[in-house]
């Protein structure tokens, strides 16, 4: 069995149980609306039931639910799920929140669609992928969903050094999740689409809060003094980018954008075959 890259260590996933990270998580930009619609179209088998793994606060699950029959939203962080219940769509009758690790939480297959929004990299692939293969319906798909809100190259060039100086994770690896899964023969890609850019207009403080929802900048991991220094430096860089025109600013909001990528396919094997 190939070891996972250190950057994807389950140790870092534990930070998503941290109350500060949970509180900051809703500040993340939403996945593109067109991507949510496309995910619903991937669920072709009847009944149109989906499983959202590592659902966090349910940005996918809550928005997918009106478009299909049922969504089981699973996360090992009780705090994330409790937050999701209180967000729009969180009390829908066809959203079933389940607290537990995907490796062993009770499931209710078959599922016409499994979604993994920026979550699969934290899991035990050798356990989870075969389990999903068994849980998928005959024409079901696993959709791996990601989003890019880092901005154009000119903006990234200025922000990246700040991120690297202050990151609580001191592991630098260029890792591609899909390549890792395919090299282990755990996932077969059937297609990929990119959606957006969609506008994202946070204030500077909302942008900083969004950064603190990431494992590398969790306040509890950074420490109070380091977190304040990070905020001050990044706030200064954002101000300079607004003044220079590299980032358009309207009133007190940053005129940014977010793109969403959906890559779908299927883990090999499984009890249900096409």
What is the predicted function of each stretch?
Residues 1-45:
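Conserved class I S-adenosyl-L-methionine
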Residues 48, 69, 112:
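Conserved acidic residues
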Residues 51, 57-104:
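Class I SAM-dependent methyltransferase SAM/SAH-binding core
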Residues 106-114:
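A short acidic, Gly/Pro-enriched loop at the edge of an enzyme's catalytic core
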Residues 116-117, 125:
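A short beta-strand submotif of the Rossmann-like class I SAM-dependent methyltransferase core
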Residues 123-132:
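A short, conserved alpha-helix within the catalytic core of class I
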Residues 133, 137-203:
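Conserved catalytic/acceptor-binding region of the Class I
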Residues 184-274:
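Conserved Class I S-adenosyl-L-methionine
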């Amino acid at each position: 069995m190939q070891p996972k890259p250190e950057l994807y260590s389950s140790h870092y996933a534990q930070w998503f149980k941290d109350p500060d990270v949970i509180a900051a998580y809703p500040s993340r930009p939403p996945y593109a609306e067109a991507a949510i619609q496309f995910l619903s179209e991937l669920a072709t088998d009847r009944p149109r039931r989906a499983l959202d793994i590592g659902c966090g606060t349910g940005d996918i699950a809550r928005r997918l639910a009106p478009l299909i029959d049922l969504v089981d939203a699973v996360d090992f962080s009780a705090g994330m799920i409790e937050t999701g219940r209180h967000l729009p769509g969180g009390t829908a009758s066809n959203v079933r929140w389940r607290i537990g690790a995907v490796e062993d939480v009770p499931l209710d297959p078959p599922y016409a669609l499994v979604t993994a929004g920026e979550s699969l990299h934290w899991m035990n692939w050798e356990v989870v992928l075969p389990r999903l293969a068994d849980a998928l319906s005959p024409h079901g798909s696993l959709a791996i969903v990601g989003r890019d809100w880092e901005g154009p190259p000119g903006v990234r060039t200025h922000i990246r050094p700040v991120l690297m100086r202050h990151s609580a994770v001191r592991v630098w690896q260029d890792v591609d999740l899909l390549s890792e899964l395919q090299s282990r023969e755990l996932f077969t890609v059937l297609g990929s689409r990119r959606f957006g850019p969609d506008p994202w207009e946070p204030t500077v403080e909302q942008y900083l809060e969004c950064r603190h929802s990431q494992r590398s900048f969790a306040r509890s991991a950074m420490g109070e003094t380091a977190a304040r220094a990070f905020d001050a430096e990044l706030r200064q860089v954002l101000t300079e980018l607004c003044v220079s025109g590299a980032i358009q600013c309207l009133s007190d909001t940053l005129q940014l954008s977010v793109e969403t990528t959906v890559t779908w396919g299927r883990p090999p094997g499984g009890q249900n075959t096409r």
